[in-house]
């Protein structure tokens, strides 16, 4: 396996994306990842199968589990219009209904999930993977004076979760978008590692590589590599030479060039071998590159593999 660790990220777990997720949806997320025929079990088996061909990995692969946001309002958009300001909607913990207008109840929900994930990992007994920490899903974090801080209070809630994770020997991670609010305060939140998304791959990219490098160095960040597969939204974001329909992708050459600039700039600017890297590849994007019969696709795939396996930080 190329990567040392994997993020288990779920972006939408409610039936209606406009409503905030409830406890039942958080449980559904757990059931998905810990299904004996899917999720972590499938990854564990995949590594076992690979070990039969190329030998056992030097260590277990780490899993970082995403923490959904305990959102203040049941329906945030309606609340901002004054139509639905319900904050007691999520469910209960030990028979007590959580009221997400209280930061202490939002913290309780976070810690409930941390405990639930740890318990399920202990019970599952995977051979090749292990839980190494938790990932804050929100890509921007608020501090006093920030946008609608009173509904978020991340400096209170996230720091409390970080402290708890560290008390039970779990890591704490964050991957914000480029120049996101909260990056400048990231050390105060208690993260073990913050990795910034350059967001350079997409057509509406706002930042230059000089600006990206400066932010990474100033705040001690890692860097995310980014591309989309054929599930990219919009479809013009796909790096593959062909679309799902089999038709040529007219945006493929542009997208390949943009992605390879990540690798080239990481090396040229001395970030390679110095800062941690993570990969975002959309839905199945890395797999699609790996099995593609297209020569240009395979060239990009092999350049990415070479970038990963030869990284001095892996040695």
Language-model segments: which ranges?
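Acidic (Asp/Glu)-rich catalytic clusters
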Residues: 50-58, 118-129, 183-190, 211-219, ...
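Substrate-binding cleft of secreted/luminal carbohydrate-active enzymes
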Residues: 179, 193-315
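Short, well-ordered coil/turn segments that N-cap beta-strands
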Residues: 59-61, 128-132, 166-172, 190-192, ...
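N-terminal catalytic cores of secreted or lumenal carbohydrate-active enzymes
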Residues: 1-111
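Generic structural signal for well-ordered alpha-helices
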Residues: 43-51, 110-122, 155-162, 209, ...
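Extracellular glycoside hydrolase catalytic/binding regions
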Residues: 113, 141-157, 162, 166-210, ...
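Aromatic-lined carbohydrate-recognition surfaces of secreted/lumenal glycan-active proteins
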Residues: 59-72, 96-113, 131-139, 158-183, ...
């Amino acid at each position: 396996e190329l990567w040392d660790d994997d993020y288990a990220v779920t972006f939408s777990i409610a039936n209606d994306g406009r409503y905030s997720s409830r406890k039942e949806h958080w449980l559904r997320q757990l059931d998905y990842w810990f299904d004996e025929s899917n999720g972590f079990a499938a990854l564990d088996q995949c590594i076992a199968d690979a070990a039969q061909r190329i030998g056992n990995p030097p260590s277990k692969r780490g899993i970082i589990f995403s923490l959904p946001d305990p959102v203040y309002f049941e329906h945030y958009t309606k609340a901002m219009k004054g139509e639905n300001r319900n904050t007691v909607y999520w469910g209960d913990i030990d028979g007590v209904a959580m009221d997400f207008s209280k930061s202490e109840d939002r913290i309780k929900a976070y810690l409930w999930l941390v405990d639930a994930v740890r318990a399920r990992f202990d019970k599952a007994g995977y051979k090749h993977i292990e839980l190494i920490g938790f990932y804050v899903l929100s890509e921007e974090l608020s501090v006093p004076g920030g946008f609608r801080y009173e509904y978020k209070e991340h400096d209170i809630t996230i720091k409390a979760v970080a402290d708890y994770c560290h008390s039970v020997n779990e890591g704490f991670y964050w991957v914000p978008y480029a120049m996101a609010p909260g990056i400048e305060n990231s050390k105060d939140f208690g993260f073990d590692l913050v990795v910034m998304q350059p967001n350079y791959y997409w057509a509406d990219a706002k930042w230059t590589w000089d600006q990206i490098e400066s932010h990474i160095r100033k705040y001690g960040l890692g860097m995310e590599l980014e591309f989309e597969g054929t599930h990219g939204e919009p479809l013009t974001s796909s790096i593959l030479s062909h679309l799902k329909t089999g038709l040529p992708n007219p945006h493929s050459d542009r997208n390949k060039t943009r992605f390879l600039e990540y690798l080239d700039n990481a090396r040229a600017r001395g970030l390679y071998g110095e800062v941690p890297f993570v990969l975002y590849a959309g839905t199945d994007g890395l797999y699609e590159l790996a099995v593609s019969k297209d020569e240009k696709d395979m060239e990009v795939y092999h350049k990415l593999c070479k970038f990963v396996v030869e990284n001095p930080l892996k040695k």
